[in-house]
Amino acid sequence: MNLFNLDRFRFEKRNKIEEAPEATPQPSQPGPSSPISLSAEEENAEGEVSRANTPDSDITEKTEDSSVPETPDNERKASISYFKNQRGIQYIDLSSDSEDVVSPNCSNTVQEKTFNKDTVIIVSEPSEDEESQGLPTMARRNDDISELEDLSELEDLKDAKLQTLKELFPQRSDNDLLKLIESTSTMDGAIAAALLMFGDAGGGPRKRKLSSSSEPYEEDEFNDDQSIKKTRLDHGEESNESAESSSNWEKQESIVLKLQKEFPNFDKQELREVLKEHEWMYTEALESLKVFAEDQDMQYVSQSEVPNGKEVSSRSQNYPKNATKTKLKQKFSMKAQNGFNKKRKKNVFNPKRVVEDSEYDSGSDVGSSLDEDYSSGEEVMEDGYKGKILHFLQDASIGELTLIPQCSQKKAQKITELRPFNSWEALFTKMSKTNGLSEDLIWHCKTLIQERDVVIRLMNKCEDISNKLTKQVTMLTGNGGGWNIEQPSILNQSLSLKPYQKVGLNWLALVHKHGLNGILADEMGLGKTIQAIAFLAYLYQEGNNGPHLIVVPASTIDNWLREVNLWCPTLKVLCYYGSQEERKQIRFNIHSRYEDYNVIVTTYNCAISSSDDRSLFRRLKLNYAIFDEGHMLKNMGSIRYQHLMTINANNRLLLTGTPVQNNLLELMSLLNFVMPHMFSSSTSEIRRMFSSKTKSADEQSIYEKERIAHAKQIIKPFILRRVKEEVLKQLPPKKDRIELCAMSEKQEQLYLGLFNRLKKSINNLEKNTEMCNVMMQLRKMANHPLLHRQYYTAEKLKEMSQLMLKEPTHCEANPDLIFEDMEVMTDFELHVLCKQYRHINNFQLDMDLILDSGKFRVLGCILSELKQKGDRVVLFSQFTMMLDILEVLLKHHQHRYLRLDGKTQISERIHLIDEFNTDMDIFVFLLSTKAGGLGINLTSANVVILHDIDCNPYNDKQAEDRCHRVGQTKEVLVIKLISQGTIEESMLKINQQKLKLEQDMTTVDEGDEGSMPADIATLLKTSMGL
C-alpha cells in the first residue's frame, strides 16, 4: 500500500465508522509523518550497519516482507507486500531528523536493498528559512549515522509520538504503541503499521463536534483540508508532502520543548494546545503565557533578556502544577464555555482568544478572545451576549454602529430605521429579511462587544496599577519617612532642579521601583532632558551604572551631549554617530570593550539604518533605553517602530511634548512600545477601538466621549504630563494671532485656475502626475505663485535651452534634454538658474513678481513693526524653497537673518543657534518646521511667525515652543499667516479639532496636576514638602 492508497484506506475506513463523541483525535499537522527517536543502544547498533543513505519509510515501503517486526517468524505472512504499488520512487529528505536512524530490526533488509534502473531518487534540501530560524536539524554525513546529543530530547520526542498514537488509538495499551514506535522510524510508518494491526484509529469520527461535556474541549487533530486529500496522479508530489509534514511535526515538537524550558510548570500537552491557539507562532504563545503567568503569579523562567523582565515572586515557586493545568485550560479553552458557533469555509486558528468569565477578576486576563470556533452545526448565541447585542443595536448611534465590522454608514442607517428590537427573535428576523442587511452583522456585533470588553479589562488592570502606586506613596508618607528623592549628588552642584522637575524625578523613580515603564510627556520647554539626566544620575547612585541608551533626533544630538556633560559630568558618554565606517569602528570598540561608557547617545537613523546597527543594539544588554521626541513612535505599523522594538533594554522611557497628536491610537502606540508585555496581546482591539477620526465637540457621541475617558484611565499609571501654565507661574504668557491674508490679484487668478483644473480632472477621473497630490499643489499656490511654473512658458524654455548651448559647461549638451529638465522646474528655480548663467541672465524675473504674494504684503508690514519695537523673530516654513524666496524678501528689506534647515550640517547647527542667541543685531532666524522645530532653544526671540501651517498642529506647537520655554523673559507672540479663501482655512479648522482632542485628554479634574493622577501628584508634593 503506497501513500496514496494509505490515504484512501483512511478515508474509506472513516466513512464506515459510527460517531463516538468521546474520541475526537487530531494530529497537530497535516499528514502525521514524523521521524522517530532512538535510544543510545539502538544508535550504537546502527553504527555496525553499512547501507545506503535512505529513509526508513522508503525501506519499509519497498520491502517484500512488510509484517510488523515484532511478529514471530513462524507467524509472518509469506510474500505479502502492502507497499508494492508505487513504482520505484525513493524519497530522501535531508531536512528530516530520521534519515540515518533505522531500527535494528530492519538492518538486514537494508543490507540487501538495491536500486534497479527504474528507481527515481528524490532529494529534498532543507529550506533557508528552516536553517535561519535555528530549527533543529540532524548533522548529515555520507555513509555515517547522525548522532542526537541530547538524550532528554529523544525521550521527549518518543513521549510526543506516544501521545499522538494514544489519541489515534485510545483503546490500545502504551506497551503496544511503544513497540510500534520502536519498530518504525517515522510517524507515517507507525500509523500505517497500527492501522494494519489494530484495524482503525480509535473507532470514532474525526469530524469536529461541539463537546457536550463540561470539560474544556480537546482540539481535533485533523482539519477539513488535512484529513481527506484529493486523488493525485503525481506520486512524487505526494511523497514530497509526506516528508514535509514529517518535518513540520518535528519542528512543532522542538517548539514545544523550547517553550517548556521557559515554563517548566506546564505540561507539554498544555503547551501544545496554547501553540495551536497561536498557529504555532512561538513568540505569540510566549507573550500570551507570560501575561497568563504574571496574572496568576506563576513561575516564569526567562532564558533570554526580555524587556521589562522582572524577578518572579517567591510564592510562585510553589504554585501547584495541577492548578496551572486547570487555569491554563480555563484560559485557552473556548468551545465548552462558549456556545457561539457559526459556519465558515475554513477553520482558521486565531491567536487572539479570550474566555468570558462569569466573575471577572480585575486585571487577571488582558488577552483577547475574538476567535469564534466553528462547527457544522446550527448557529448558537449564548444568552449573555444576546442581551448585550440587543441593547447595543437598540441604543447605539449611527457612528457607533459603523464600528461593527463590515457595517457601513448606509447599513447603520437601515438598522436605526428597523428599531425597536423587542426580542432576540424580532432582531434576527428583521436583520435577515431586510435588503442590504444580514444576520452576519449580529455575529460581527459580538466581535465589537468583545473588543470593548478587552479595553475594559485593560482599564481595570491599569486602575489596579494606579492604586498600587497611590498606596505606596500613602504608606511611605504615613510612616513619616516620606517619598523624597533629593537631587542626586553627582549632578553639577552649581545647577539645581526646579520643584516640578524634582516631582518628575520622584515619579520616574516610583514607576521604576514598581517595574513599570513610563512616558514623560511634560509640555515642551519644561526640561524633560534635564529630568531624564537626573534620573540616570539617580540610577548611577543606586548602583545601576548602565549601559543606558539615549535615542534622539539628529538635530538635538549636540544639545544632548552638551547637557549631559554640563549636568552630570560623572556619566561617561559614548556618541554612536557618524558615517558607516566611523560607526563600524565604534561597534568594534564596543565589542572589544575598548570603550568605557555609561550612556550611549545615538540618533533614530543611526540606530536602525543598517543590519549591523540593529544587530548591535539587539545584542547589547542595556538597562534603560530613553527615546527623545517619542512621538516619532506614534505608528505601531511603521518599520522604524518595529526595528526599535527589538532593542534589548530592560526598561524604556519615552520623552515627548505631544503624546496626543492626530488620534488616540497614536497614544496607545506609545503605551504599547513602553509596556509591550501588557498591551501587545491586545493591539488589534486597541487599533479598532481608538483609531476613529477626531471630531469637534458638537459632533462627539456619548461613546466617543467615553472612549476618551477610557484612554485617560488606561494611560494614568504610565504617563506624567504637566503644562507650563500650571507649573511655571513665572513663565511669561503666550498669545496666538491669526492673520488672514488676502491673495494678490494675480495670485488669486492663478489659484482659481488651478483649482478648476484639478476639479475638472477629478470629475473626469483623469490620471496624471498632477493629481498625485492635489492638496500640496493648492497649498503651494496659496503660499506663493512662484512655487509653480506660470511665467516661464514653453516658448521661453525652448529659447533658453538653445542659449544654454553657448555656456562652456553645456556647449555639447542636447537642447531637447535641457528643455525637458527645465519643464519640471518651478518659476523660482528657473529664476535662480537665470542668475547663474550669463547667456540667459536676461530672463530673470522682476522683483515685483517675486514679491507678488498676499502673505508677503502682510509679512513686510509685520516685520517693520516688530523691528521698531525691538522684538526678534523666528520665522518657520514647511518648504525649503519658500525659505529661498523669503531670503529674497529679507534682503530686499535689509533685515539681518540666519537660516537653518534639513540641509544644514549637524555640526553647524549648534553654532548657528549660539550665534543667534548671542548676537542681538540678528533680526530673523529662518527655520524649516521639521528641522528647526525639535529640541532647539531660541529664547532670545519673542515672536514666532508661521508662514505656512502644518497639517499636524503639534509640529507647529513644537516650533512655537522654541521660544516659549524655560529661560524666556518676554511675552511670546505667535502669528499664523493664513491665505484667505484657500485650502489653508480648512486645514486650520481641522487642526483646531485635533487640538481639542489634547484638551479633552489633559482636562484637569479638580485637584489634578496636568493629566497626572491627583492623589499621586498631591502625595508626592506633600511627601517632598513642596
Swiss-Prot record:
Residue spans of biased composition, Polar residues class: 314-323
Keywords, comma-separated and alphabetical: Acetylation, ATP-binding, Chromatin regulator, Chromosome, DNA damage, DNA repair, DNA-binding, Ectodermal dysplasia, Helicase, Hydrolase, Isopeptide bond, Nucleotide-binding, Nucleus, Palmoplantar keratoderma, Phosphoprotein, Repeat, Ubl conjugation
Span list, region Disordered: 1-82, 203-251, 302-328, 354-373
Compartment(s): Nucleus; Chromosome
Phosphotyrosine PTM sites in chain numbering: Y217
Gene Ontology terms, MF aspect: ATP binding; ATP hydrolysis activity; ATP-dependent chromatin remodeler activity; chromatin binding; DNA binding; helicase activity; nucleosome array spacer activity; ubiquitin binding
Motif range (DEGH box): 628-631
Modified residues (Phosphothreonine): T54, T71
Residues with the N-acetylmethionine modification: M1
Top enzyme category: hydrolase
EC nos: 3.6.4.12
GO terms under cellular component: chromatin; heterochromatin; nuclear replication fork; nucleoplasm; nucleus; site of double-strand break
Residues engaged in binding ATP: 521-529, 897-904
Pfam family of the protein (one): SNF2-rel_dom
Tissue-wise expression: Isoform 1 is expressed ubiquitously. Isoform 3 is expressed mainly in skin and esophagus. Expressed in fibroblasts and keratinocytes (at protein level).
Coiled coil: none
Catalytic activity entry: ATP + H2O = ADP + phosphate + H(+)
Magnesium recorded as keyword: no
Keyword Oxidoreductase: no
Domain of life: Eukaryota
Recorded consequence of changing K528R: No effect on subcellular localization and on histone deacetylation
GO annotation (BP), single: chromatin remodeling
Role this protein plays: DNA helicase that possesses intrinsic ATP-dependent nucleosome-remodeling activity and is both required for DNA repair and heterochromatin organization. Promotes DNA end resection of double-strand breaks (DSBs) following DNA damage: probably acts by weakening histone DNA interactions in nucleosomes flanking DSBs. Required for the restoration of heterochromatin organization after replication. Acts at replication sites to facilitate the maintenance of heterochromatin by directing H3 and H4 histones deacetylation, H3 'Lys-9' trimethylation (H3K9me3) and restoration of silencing.
Family the entry assigns: Belongs to the SNF2/RAD54 helicase family.
Clinical condition linked: Adermatoglyphia: An autosomal dominant condition characterized by the lack of epidermal ridges on the palms and soles, which results in the absence of fingerprints, and is associated with a reduced number of sweat gland openings and reduced sweating of palms and soles. Basan syndrome: An autosomal dominant form of adermatoglyphia associated with congenital facial milia, acral blistering, digital contractures, and nail abnormalities. Adermatoglyphia is defined by the lack of epidermal ridges on the palms and soles, which results in the absence of fingerprints.
Protein name listed in UniProt: SWI/SNF-related matrix-associated actin-dependent regulator of chromatin subfamily A containing DEAD/H box 1
Lineage of producing organism: Eukaryota, Metazoa, Chordata, Craniata, Vertebrata
Name of the gene this protein is made from: SMARCAD1
